[in-house]
Curated annotation (Swiss-Prot):
Lineage top rank: taxon: Eukaryota
Source organism: Homo sapiens (Human)
Transmembrane segments: none
Protein name: Epithelial-stromal interaction protein 1
InterPro entries tied to this protein: EPSTI1
PANTHER family assigned to the protein according to its UniProt record, in alphabetical order: EPITHELIAL-STROMAL INTERACTION PROTEIN 1
Amino acid sequence: MNTRNRVVNSGLGASPASRPTRDPQDPSGRQGELSPVEDQREGLEAAPKGPSRESVVHAGQRRTSAYTLIAPNINRRNEIQRIAEQELANLEKWKEQNRAKPVHLVPRRLGGSQSETEVRQKQQLQLMQSKYKQKLKREESVRIKKEAEEAELQKMKAIQREKSNKLEEKKRLQENLRREAFREHQQYKTAEFLSKLNTESPDRSACQSAVCGPQSSTWKLPILPRDHSWARSWAYRDSLKAEENRKLQKMKDEQHQKSELLELKRQQQEQERAKIHQTEHRRVNNAFLDRLQGKSQPGGLEQSGGCWNMNSGNSWGI
C-alpha cells in the first residue's frame, strides 16, 4: 500500500557550503543548479557508496524529487485482505442461515362453514338490530349518568346533614355552658348578698329571731326585690333563641319539602320515560312482525296495494 510521507526539503537541510554558488556573469542564474532528473540520478548513485543512518532507518523508501515513497508491507496487506474476505464470508453465511423461511398454510375454504344465504340473513338481522342496540346503549349511558348524579346528590345531602348535626351539637354545648356559668354566677351573687345582709343588720336579725322564736323554729330568707332589667335581658335572650330555633326548623322543613318534591319529580320522569320506552318498543315489534308477515305471504304486497310498504316505512321512522 502506497502512502505519502512528510515532505523532505533537500534545499533547506543542506549546509551553506554545499549549496551551489551563483555566477554573477550568468544572467539566468541556473549555473550550478541541477535538474530533478539529474538530482535523482545522483541520489541513487550516492546511496551504495556511503550508506548513512537515514538510509538504514528508512529502508524500503525511495526518494522522488521532494517526496519520499514508502513501499507497502505485503504481509500486513495480505492479512487485512484475508480478514476482510473471512468477515464477508461469515456475513453471507449468517444471511443464509437467518433468511426468512417460506410460509406453508393449509388451504381452506373462505367464508367458514356457513352458506352465503345464511351470512346475508345474519348481516341483515344485525343491520336491523343495530339501531335498537345504539338506542339501548344511549339509554344505558343516560341511566349510568343519572345514577352518578343521584349518588353525588345523596353525598352532598349527607354532608349537609352532618354539618347541621354538628351545628346543633355545638349550640347545645354552648347553651349548657351558658346555663352552668349563669348558675355559678347566681350562686355567687346570692352568697354575697346573704353575707352582706348578715353583716349589716345583726341586731335586726337577732331581734326577729327573738320575737319569732317561740312561734316558729325555722328561719326563712327574706324576699329579695326582683331586678326588672335582668329579667328583661334574659327574656330578650330567650326570645332571640326561640326565634333562631324557629327559623332553623323552618329552613329544615323547607329543605325536606324540596327534597321530597325533587324525588317525586324524578319518579314521575322515570315513569314517563318507562312508558315512552315501552310504547316505542311495542310499536317497533309490531312493525317488525308486520314486515315478517308480509314477507311470508306470497301476495301480501300486491293485495295491500303498496299501503303496507308505506305503513312499514312510517313505522320505522323513515
